Amino acid sequence: MKIDSPEFFNNREISWLQFNERVLGEVTDTRNPLMERFKFLGIFSSNLDEFYMVRVGGLKDEVLAGFNKPENKQQLTPKQQLRAIATKTKELVDQQYEAFKDVTQALKAEGISFLKHDELNEMQSEYVKTFFREQVFPVLTPVAVDAYRPFPMLSSKSLNIATALEAEDGSKRNLALVQVPAVLPRFVDLPVDDEETTAVILLEDVIISFIDSLFKGYHVLSAMPFRITRNADLPFHEEGTHDLLKLIEKELKKRRWGVGIRLEIQKNAINTNLLNMLRDVLDLQDRDIYAVDGPIDLTFAFAFYSQIGVEYDHLIYQTIMPVEPPALEKSKKLFDQILQQDYLLHHPYHTFDPIVRLIVQAANDPNVLAIKQTLYRVSGDSPIIKALKTAAENGKQVTVLVELKARFDEAKNIEWAKQLEKAGAHVIYGYSDLKTHSKITLIVRLQEGRIQRFVHLGTGNYNDSTAKLYTDIGLLTAKEQIAEDATNFFNWLSGYGEQPEWNALHTSPNSMLEKFLSLIDEEIKYHKKHGNGRIVAKMNSLTEKDIIVKLYQASRAGVRIELIVRGVCCLRPQIKGVSENIRVTSVVDRYLEHSRIFYFHHNGDDLIYCSSADWMTRNMRKRIEILFPIADEEQKNYIKDCLALTMADNVKAREQDDSGNYHYVTKGKQECESQILIQLYTNGKLKAKPSFEHPLEQKWTPVERAEEKITFDPTTSKK
């Protein structure tokens, strides 16, 4: 039997759509607070936008270039993948708008209404009329489309209205476009009689209601909202360039104007002539057109949530207060504490504050000589950037690798790079054709007359905002072997020369893949000898074929394998004779599962590694990543307990079957929602937990009312 046959794999693109389907499942999950369900509609839409701009855009490029080679797992050609994507996406979008109707109906029952113009009362009608005249009309620009004024280049993801016009005397018909201004809020908060209620109208509905005023002497026969998504998969041709920053700045300007790859139209406003015109101008096929049964672009759910939803605290998640890691005292200098022991941080259950505090203390400590750090994505008002600038201004040697090719953060990172350079930091951009995705900080300090190095390693970005929403692992250490590796790592990044030999770390694209394959091979050998082989791996996505085939070999040898893969999973479990010893689950909940953790039983030695890398082809072969060990037994036990809770999840976990489909995990006698229970466990408030050896055996009883045991942050409420 060939274990690398196409029938034993899932296609990457379809697997991603299945992940987004699980996100959509959070909209329909009535256990979630209502406004959170509405927000998940925005997450689904935002995810799909990026998928089309990057993945579908890349496949379209391959088709246009005449590239017809099948991908290396299911052996589907680019054209076959595009057809499969369109079929699955149309199915999901239909489900999304059914969910939108259900959620908005439920919001209406809570006193939150989305109104059409013909549903407004007299007071609201007058308000909207004035609002349009004073705030909307001045910024609108009607654009005629005819022989002298060709179809304009509309930017990607902009919302527009196509209009069919007829002269009042009936002498001629014309076409025109009106862009819905992105500078105005997408929804208008309306006056209401009852202060306990909220009513809004969407901006495009306001414009359509008064669109006649833009075309004097014409009747508007039809007004059809539409939205174009353009290819944003722009390759940066780095070879031969002398200034990567300027190259990327130049290429970014093209992103808004890439080839059209998707057209969204509003189903209840379709005009055949307008639709045909758009299809021809954009050179799209029927499968690229999505008629939606509701407002186009539900990403406005984010703004609605932050501006209106938060006023209804019974409709949103209660804020969980993160805790300081045990034994880490805020009153003491971090350097002194890290010298005494390693500290493991598990965000967002542990606060991200110690990481910020470390950089701030280093920036202002006269004994700190140098700070070196990699940055991939940071927050909009980053305290990390501020501290690094302060350090440079204080005369310290500051070296920062800013990854300019971080997708959709390129412009922000260019600005950060300029600011850091202006402050006196040495800014580098990494290696040609490789993204630096590693998360590492090295601080060099004069400690009692000798050089002492401090290191932070993590699975997630140095982003204080996403650290509240993403689960990640971080390690603070002063261990000499890791410190030496960190020094060599930064010297390799900033200088020339081959990658050094490592003491404790492993990196891609050089040694990490080989390390993982070796660890799996060792587990096979131990199982054949002792019968106790086991692998537990948690990650965002799994696409690397060499690792998948090696896991199949381990499964056939009898090794017990549990994979927690939130997103794409090209491995297919539970296939007799191939992967029957592999279980794959995915947890989608309030926090985005982002940590990468790898456990190998190793005949009782319990090897645990964390990494910035997933088991993906791009991470193993096209990015600079770091794999680091967890050595402390107490920290290893904590990670094993968290993995056990995640494997035992029967509320938010879905399990993949042998056909590649996902289903909710079967409920047992008691519910286990892993994120809630991990918070309790981290806070020291969980009375019992599942065993790591047998997490599915329900012989433990957690607290009965978990949510009451967590410390919540009080919020003001409208209701």
From Swiss-Prot:
ATP binds at N47, Y470, R566, H594. InterPro entries: PP_kinase, PP_kinase_C_1, PP_kinase_middle, PP_kinase_middle_dom_sf, PPK_C_dom2, PPK_N_dom, PPK_N_dom_sf. The keyword Metal-binding applies. Pfam families: PP_kinase (PF02503), PP_kinase_C (PF13090), PP_kinase_C_1 (PF17941), PP_kinase_N (PF13089). GO terms for cellular component: polyphosphate kinase complex. This is Polyphosphate kinase. The active site is at H437. An intermediate of this reaction is the autophosphorylated ppk in which a phosphate is covalently linked to a histidine residue through a N-P bond. GO terms for molecular function: ATP binding; metal ion binding; polyphosphate kinase activity. PANTHER family: POLYPHOSPHATE KINASE. The keyword Calcium does not apply. Its EC number is 2.7.4.1. Keywords: ATP-binding, Kinase, Magnesium, Metal-binding, Nucleotide-binding, Phosphoprotein, Transferase. It comes from Exiguobacterium sibiricum (strain DSM 17290 / CCUG 55495 / CIP 109462 / JCM 13490 / 255-15). GO terms for biological process: polyphosphate biosynthetic process. Catalyzes the reversible transfer of the terminal phosphate of ATP to form a long-chain polyphosphate (polyP). CDD domains: PLDc_PaPPK1_C1_like (cd09165), PLDc_PaPPK1_C2_like (cd09168). It catalyses: [phosphate](n) + ATP = [phosphate](n+1) + ADP. It is an enzyme of class 2 (transferase). Mg(2+) binds at R377, R407. Belongs to the polyphosphate kinase 1 (PPK1) family. Its cofactor is Mg(2+).
